[in-house]
Amino acid sequence: MPETVHVVVQYGGRDLAGVIRGDESWSAAAKRLAATMSGEPAALDLSGTDKRFVVDPDLRVGLRSMTRGDLPDVARWRAADHVNRWWSDDGSPDLATVTEKYGPHIDGTTPTRMWVVEANGRSVGFVQDYRLSDYPDFALLTPDPEAIGVDYAIGEEAWVGKGLGSRMLWAWLLRTRHRFPDAATFFAAPDHRNLASLRVLEKVGFTQGTWFDEPQSDGSSATVVGCTLDVRRVLG
């Protein structure tokens, strides 16, 4: 007999609980429970036995396509200690280097796409994504070369530790599910020391897998943790 999976939607200080029906995804079950609420459920913590979602009309988190006009913000975010520690392999965070690195992604001349995260209309961070198979050397290190890879950063330090990480990744998941309807899995590979990032991934439904060494631009390697999300199970 299949294990019963419980879903809880938090809204306005109260919890609404139910169970997943048959082949229903976790997201679909949350939407069903939240049908009468004023807002869409977002993942709060999907790492436990109960899959917990939240409806918070006061926090609107979304993504928009990055433009070259965003690059000064990206350079400022990249220069912040809490970001640069994990993004140093992308080069110096000065504007010229950032423009050289990300400009082609913005222009659409590479397989990578860039997104700006907005919280209540304010730009607060960025996300980049790509199909792993478009970068064969990296894809060989991963369990599913056709997965969609993602990297992300909260740029504004004031938003760190406020629950934005899971909200921005959830917004990315929903958008990417429609952009890549054939993708069975999504993939992220944070540095093994980046415990905050690993925890955020768990909260939105990723599971940790193989540790592997990712070559860096300076000839060294970084030990990362491959994290995979089952699109059908989590999003439907």
Residues of each region from the PLM?
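Acyl-donor (CoA/ACP) binding surface of acyl/acetyltransferases
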Residues: M1-E3, V9-R14, V19-G22, W26-L59, ...
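Residues that form generic nucleotide/phosphate-binding pockets
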Residues: T36, W77, W86, K101-H105
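Active-site rim helix/loop that mediates acceptor-substrate recognition in acyltransferases
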Residues: G91-M114, A119
